[in-house]
């Protein structure tokens, strides 16, 4: 499971997931990737499940990049606890994902294999995604250059 080694603050505010991703919204390392179409919190368990689904399908060929990292702690109070007495203890870690963010990248495999591997990963995630290549952008058109 992915989580930070050290954090400055153990508990953080929930925040808002407005707007589109301004960083990490194109394929940079690999040849193919999946891009989020809606905002969501993706937990470290979901990231790991998607990674395992991809790597099992491509077997030994290819390389996979995880482009998101769960750096936000989500707290939870114990069951049957009265309100008050402070914020709960950190329960799990999430990555805040906005529309347009590339979540996973893959290289070294044919496009059909990459498409199927990334499709399997998409089913493990709580966010609607689309398959993108190094040529396509958020709008879906290919670059002229």
Swiss-Prot record:
This chain belongs to the protein called Large ribosomal subunit protein uL16
Provide one Gene Ontology biological process annotation.
translation
Q: What is the protein's species of origin?
A: Ruminiclostridium cellulolyticum (strain ATCC 35319 / DSM 5812 / JCM 6584 / H10) (Clostridium cellulolyticum)
Q: Which GO terms describe its cellular component?
A: cytosolic large ribosomal subunit
Query: What spans are recorded as compositionally biased (Basic residues)?
Result: 1-17
Query: Region Disordered: what ranges?
Result: 1-22
MF annotations from Gene Ontology: rRNA binding; structural constituent of ribosome; tRNA binding
Q: Organism's domain of life?
A: Bacteria
């Amino acid at each position: 499971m992915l989580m930070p080694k050290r954090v400055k603050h153990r508990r953080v505010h929930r925040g808002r997931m407005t707007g589109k991703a301004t960083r990490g919204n194109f394929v940079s390392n690999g040849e193919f990737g999946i891009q989020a179409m809606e905002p969501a919190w993706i937990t470290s368990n979901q990231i790991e499940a998607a990674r395992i689904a991809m790597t099992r399908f491509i077997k030994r060929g290819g390389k996979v990049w995880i482009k998101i990292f769960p750096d936000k702690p989500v707290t939870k109070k114990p069951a049957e606890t009265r309100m008050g007495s402070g914020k709960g203890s950190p329960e799990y870690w999430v990555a805040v994902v906005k529309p347009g963010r590339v979540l996973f990248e893959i290289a070294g495999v044919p496009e059909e294999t990459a498409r199927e591997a990334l499709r399997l990963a998409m089913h493990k995630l709580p966010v609607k995604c689309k398959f993108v290549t190094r040529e396509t952008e958020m709008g879906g058109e290919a670059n002229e250059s």
